[in-house]
C-alpha cells in the first residue's frame, strides 16, 4: 500500500521476488495516493526504486517526494475557464478498458475545485463514456464533461505498468454549453456584420457605377 513503509516495501519486494531480472529503473514506482508529510500538513506523492548490485542483490530503496502543491502550479486550471469553473486531476486506474461504459479513476492530484463524486468513495471518480468518444462524470450532483489524456509513466514491460495514469480536465456541462452558446452568438454576429458590410459595399459600388 501507499503508506510510508509500503512505499519502500512495494518496490523492494517486487524486485526481490523477481530476482532483479530487470533494471532498477524498471522497478521504479510512483505512489497512486498522496499522503501527508511527517510533521507537516503538506501532501506529496513519492517515486521510489530499488538499489540493485551487479550480481542482482537487492539491498535497499531510494526515493524522492514531490509536493502536490508544486504539481498544482503546473496544472493551471484557470486555462480551462476564466471563471475557474474547470478542474484538472491527475488520476490513476488499473482498469484495462471501459467496463460497462464506466472507468474508475483514483484522484492523485487535484488542481481547481476538489469535486466529490456522488456515486463512488471519496477519492474515486466514475468516468462514463457518452458513446461519441467523450466522457462525463457526475460530481457534486452536476454533470461534468471529462477529457482524458494518457500520461506515459511506465514502459509496457514494467512491473507497475498496470497502473495507468491520466491527466483529466473537467468542465461543468452547463458552463460548457454556455461557452458554446457564446461562441455561437459571436459567430452569428460576425456573419451578420460580414453580410451587412457586403451589402453596403455592393450598394456603394452600384451607386458609384450609376
Predicted regions: what is each one?
Residues 41-53, 57-60, 111-186:
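Extracellular/periplasmic juxtamembrane segments that couple receptor/chemosensory ectodomains to their
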Residues 13-19, 52, 92-95, 148-156:
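Short regulatory "switch" loops immediately downstream of catalytic or recognition motifs
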Residues 92, 166-210:
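Cytoplasm-proximal transmembrane signaling helix
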Residues 57-108:
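Solvent-exposed, extracytoplasmic
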Residues 1-2, 100, 205-210:
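Short, intrinsically disordered, charge-balanced linker/junction segments flanking boundaries
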Residues 1-63:
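Extracytoplasmic/periplasmic ligand-binding sensor regions of membrane-associated signaling proteins
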Residues 23-25, 83-84, 160-162:
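Short helix-terminating capping/connector loops at secondary-structure junctions
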Amino acid at each position: 500500500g501507499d503508506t510510508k513503509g509500503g512505499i519502500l516495501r512495494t518496490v523492494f519486494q517486487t524486485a526481490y521476488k523477481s530476482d532483479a531480472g530487470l533494471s532498477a529503473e524498471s522497478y521504479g514506482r510512483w505512489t497512486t495516493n498522496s499522503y501527508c508529510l511527517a510533521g507537516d500538513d503538506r501532501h506529496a506523492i513519492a517515486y521510489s526504486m530499488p538499489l540493485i548490485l551487479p550480481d542482482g542483490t537487492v539491498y535497499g530503496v531510494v526515493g524522492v517526494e514531490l509536493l502536490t502543491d508544486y504539481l498544482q502550479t503546473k496544472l493551471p486550471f484557470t486555462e480551462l475557464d476564466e471563471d475557474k469553473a474547470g478542474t484538472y486531476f491527475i488520476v490513476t486506474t488499473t482498469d484495462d478498458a471501459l467496463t460497462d461504459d464506466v472507468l474508475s479513476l483514483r484522484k492523485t492530484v487535484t488542481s481547481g475545485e476538489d469535486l466529490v463524486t456522488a456515486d463512488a468513495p471519496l477519492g474515486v471518480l466514475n468516468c462514463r463514456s457518452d458513446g461519441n468518444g467523450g466522457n462525463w462524470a457526475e460530481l457534486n450532483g452536476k454533470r461534468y464533461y471529462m477529457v482524458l489524456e494518457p500520461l506515459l509513466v511506465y514502459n509496457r514491460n514494467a512491473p507497475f505498468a498496470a497502473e495507468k495514469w491520466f491527466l483529466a480536465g473537467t468542465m461543468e456541462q452547463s458552463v460548457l454549453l454556455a461557452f458554446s452558446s457564446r461562441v455561437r452568438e459571436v459567430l452569428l454576429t460576425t456573419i451578420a456584420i460580414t453580410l451587412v458590410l457586403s451589402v453596403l459595399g455592393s450598394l456603394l459600388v452600384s451607386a458609384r457605377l450609376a
